[in-house]
Amino acid sequence: PLSIYAKTKLQGEYEALKHVGPVSIIRTAFYGINPFSKKSLLWWIIDNAQNKREMDGWENMYFSPVSANKLVDVIENMFNESLTGIYNVGSVDSCNKFDFVEAVCDGINQPVKINRIITKQNKETLIRPDYSVLSSEKLKGVMTWNTKWCDDLDAYLNNMLPFPEE
């Protein structure tokens, strides 16, 4: 693992696999609005855009985001089909954080200045790797999975939960 964050996630997987009985582990990078908390990337982007605050978008940090709605669909399918094992749940394509921020702002019709930023991390300060794209090939082998990040984001933004109260 490249960071403490990754190391503790892996330790959690090892602990789960020690469980007696069926185990399912999902690796994902999901986004969504929690109506009880403001701590999410999506909420941060929308809040900044609505308040016309400029943001930084990292051009060299790639991921394969999926909405909380799609993740729930996968979990429901895994439960109904009694699927066990370790599965990556990510969009079939990927984007960088700049593209994600820009797509959210476009999707909510809130133009705002987004600075193109290149992160420079060293091993001592590394929180997340620059490339954290997940391959969902194993998932595609057990269920229909063709979720593209931009289509999923558009659908999520069009049916989004309300924002947390102040």
Language model: regions and residue ranges:
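Residue-level signal for the nucleotide or nucleotide-sugar donor/cofactor binding architecture
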Residues: 3, 63-66, 95, 134, ...
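Amphipathic alpha-helical segments that line or abut small-molecule/effector binding pockets
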Residues: 69-77, 154
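Glycine-rich Rossmann NAD(P)(H)-binding loop
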Residues: 57-62, 87-95, 141
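Amphipathic terminal alpha-helices
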Residues: 148-166
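Mid/C-terminal beta-alpha module of Rossmann-like enzyme folds, strongest
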Residues: 74, 81-124, 130, 164-166
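A hydrophobic C-terminal alpha-helical subdomain
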Residues: 121-142, 146
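Active-site helix of classical SDR
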Residues: 8
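NAD(P)-dependent short-chain dehydrogenase/reductase
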Residues: 14-63, 70
